[in-house]
């Protein structure tokens, strides 16, 4: 769950040396046969591929890669050249003139800034600028504004993943040379893809997030029973504090989420940005489009005080994971965020037998509430050999710091010492 917007970067880095690059024509690149069997095509819009065809490859277990999600981002104007997220999705097809078959797909964007990625490379852009080089545009395989690990390259059954990964990497390098992109970044991939890309000599980067895991709890109290006495009392006080103020919660799913709910929720979401003098990444049209096109994946938790809503949190339902994504409120209240974003989600997972909550970026305070620190990954290809070497050295040192932090942070978990969770 996004707790708050992240600090804005310094101005002047967002469009470095892209004046002579027509970003709107990226997807017009001529299809080049890459192997005797397959060819790669880059498309400037998700509308250039049929939704059923795309979704057959991506599956339904990870909602953010669904055609409907990417389409909502485009149609609402959240991903385009103006926002720095120009779609350029990669399709791998059989190399036949008649009825080519889609056998792999990958989300891809040409980026002219580093906003909304949650893997921070502003210092890399700084270094390029200091040496008179352009860091932007860069190529990014990610889900915009969504720091949730999941599939990044989806491949048909019976096709060698290693072959597709090699093929895509080769074509990415050609594309980067053609459009003068500095690099390719694969953000929050699954471990198997990260390993495969490491074998192709992409640099590997680690990060940390906090996730909740369901040990087949029968109820919230059974989860609390795993806490030490003091931590258990603290959490119960937090929930009691909210209940004593007369705040009640509605867990709305699918078509039970109506237009007025979206209006209230967007007011909450927007407030988390406006209070810091920033415009939100997403607009109200994006959320209403999600409600129309993929309601089966949505859980909206709304907090009501007396006769009006005061806070809300939006979750996405995956195959075995509840993804906490956006939240906001119009009344600041102690513990309201924890109840709306964490405890309501835990209640829902226990009731519905969901294995895990992925709460997104940030939030060290989640640890003492039972969210475990977990390692996240990203993979990076840097075209410039000298910068690639320098960044590799930086990442080696950073990775050690991350590993040390993961071990240290785990010591702050609230669980009883006699339990192994």
Say what each PLM segment does.
Residues 1-421:
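N-acyltransferase acceptor-side catalytic subdomain
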């Amino acid at each position: 769950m996004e707790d708050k917007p992240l600090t804005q970067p310094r101005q002047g880095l967002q469009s470095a040396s892209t004046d002579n690059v027509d970003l709107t024509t990226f997807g017009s690149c001529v299809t080049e046969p890459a192997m005797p069997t397959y060819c790669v095509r880059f498309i400037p819009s998700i509308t250039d591929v049929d939704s059923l065809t795309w979704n057959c490859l991506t599956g339904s277990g990870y909602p953010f890669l669904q055609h409907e999600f990417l389409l909502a981002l485009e149609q609402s104007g959240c991903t385009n050249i103006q926002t720095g997220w120009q779609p350029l999705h990669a399709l791998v097809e059989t190399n036949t003139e008649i009825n080519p078959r889609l056998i792999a797909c990958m989300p891809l964007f040409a980026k002219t800034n580093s906003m909304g990625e949650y893997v921070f490379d502003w210092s890399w852009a700084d270094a390029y600028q200091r040496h008179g080089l352009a860091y932007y545009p860069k190529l990014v395989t990610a889900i915009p504004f969504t720091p949730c690990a999941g599939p990044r390259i989806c491949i048909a059954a019976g096709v060698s993943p290693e072959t597709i990964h090699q093929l895509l990497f080769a074509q990415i390098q050609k594309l980067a040379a053609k459009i003068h992109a500095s690099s390719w970044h694969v953000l929050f991939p699954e471990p198997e893809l990260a390993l495969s890309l490491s074998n192709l000599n992409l640099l590997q980067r680690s990060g940390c997030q906090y996730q909740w895991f369901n040990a087949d709890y029968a109820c919230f109290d059974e989860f609390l029973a795993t806490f030490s006495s003091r931590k258990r009392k603290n959490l119960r006080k937090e929930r009691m504090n909210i209940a004593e103020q007369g705040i009640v919660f509605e867990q709305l799913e699918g078509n039970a989420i109506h237009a007025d709910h979206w209006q209230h929720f967007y007011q909450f979401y927007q407030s988390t940005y406006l209070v810091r003098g920033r415009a939100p990444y997403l607009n109200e049209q994006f959320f209403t489009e999600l409600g129309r096109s993929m309601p089966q994946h949505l859980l909206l938790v709304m907090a009501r005080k007396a006769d009006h809503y005061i806070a809300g949190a939006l979750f996405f339902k995956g195959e075995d994971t509840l993804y906490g994504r956006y939240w906001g409120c119009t009344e600041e209240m102690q513990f309201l965020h924890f109840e709306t974003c964490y405890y309501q989600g835990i209640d829902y997972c226990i009731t519905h037998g969901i294995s895990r909550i992925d709460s997104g970026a940030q939030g060290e305070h989640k640890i003492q509430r039972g969210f475990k620190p977990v390692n996240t990954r990203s993979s990076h290809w840097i075209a410039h050999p000298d910068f690639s070497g320098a960044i590799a050295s930086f990442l080696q040192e950073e990775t050690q710091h991350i590993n040390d932090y993961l071990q240290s942070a785990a010591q702050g978990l609230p669980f009883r010492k006699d339990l192994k969770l």
